[in-house]
């Protein structure tokens, strides 16, 4: 299932919406200058996790691994709600570290690294700041060719391994299965089923799939969780789209040209219309982006427009970087070069909207009119969402079914039971209790594929014992070396997780496991104890 998360304008990144959190603390409650934060002291590490998610088992396993290796006490600390954990993170009252991670918004190494570790980034919860790291990201952003950018990203990750403001744990696969009625089912680079390609021999050819109730209206600029996003990706089409492997393909755009990664000219293909017959023009994008960026509109996806000139987090301001040339052409000026800007334009925050959206955004969000391969027929809250093929769709995705009906669930156990009974055609997850057996139960109908999803520990580097000094680096490296990732992935997750080699994900173009310094991810009890002893010689934990 996809855990929904509502965030503020400067809030948690979209890609992290599915994650629980954990805390490692060496400070007593109320001690030091940080004040009364979460965690326990007297040399004990607390591993906090949100107990409204499936995190208890792995948290216990990590505690056990670290405690055994370092000879210290590390205990799980359940926190009732994800929102409570999130509040403590944003207020920086966690006395140590917490689990974090990233699920890619779009297939770019830059999306992982900028969002989570660049100085001042909205999801930089460790409060990490490194001029060397930031400069390498800037060089990558200004690179004229992808290979040069990949080289800078590799160097940037090497700096992260030297500092360890975060500790990568594992990559998560997309896993699930399909019914005896279904065929041609596959998952893409984000572990999302490729719904339009799926077929069903039942239900009149309509494919039944699981989803959870979207947490917000289905307005592209106001959606920040996976459930609503999946519907939007079927009802709308953007300037570009991503194929199953994350490669970029022009969709509504005929061309997106730049000579400096800062100034872009975007030309649209003629003939595109929304499902109500109104034309898709340059204004459809310009108006939608300006609406999404305006502070007073309080759109949850507003941060996607922060790179465009004129954006402000503090007051209403026009996106002056958007200029209409003619009905099929507009230009974009960014505040600074961004080599992944074109890649980002396939995200649903950048989808076009017709004029009707701005006349009554609330009504539009309840039943959006899009330009994608499907149109929304009905949304029966907490029950189902019905989509039918859109005959006006002019893009490159082939619809192989008679429609998609999302059944809205609150439990993966119910999803899996319905899958076994052929009551749904596609399930995009299974309960943790079924992980050891689902591939055997489903046989060739089981799916288990890598996804653009990484999990790790994020360390607040401003807190005592964890700062950006010799002691803090040694402690983080000791913990990193003390976690037996392979054992946890094998024994708890049965091949649905893979030990991490970096801070991104293998399904993203440009990924490499050859990053200098990533040997610190190797389980090495002796080296872990040596590093912890070095930190203890500086300051007793």
Where do the model's predicted regions map?
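N-terminal lobe/hinge region of extracytoplasmic solute-binding protein
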Residues: 168, 210-260, 369
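Structural transition elements
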Residues: 28-30, 53-57, 181-182, 188-191, ...
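Periplasmic-binding protein-like
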Residues: 57-58, 157-170, 468-509, 524
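Ligand-site clamp/hinge motif
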Residues: 359-365, 392-437, 452
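Gly/Pro-rich hinge or "lid" segments in bacterial periplasmic/extracellular proteins
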Residues: 215-217, 223-226, 233, 243-245, ...
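A structural "hinge/loop" feature
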Residues: 177-193, 211-232, 252, 278, ...
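Extracytoplasmic/peripheral linker and loop segments enriched in polar/acidic and small residues
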Residues: 13, 68, 72-85, 91, ...
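Surface-exposed binding/hinge segments that line
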Residues: 181, 257, 293, 300-355
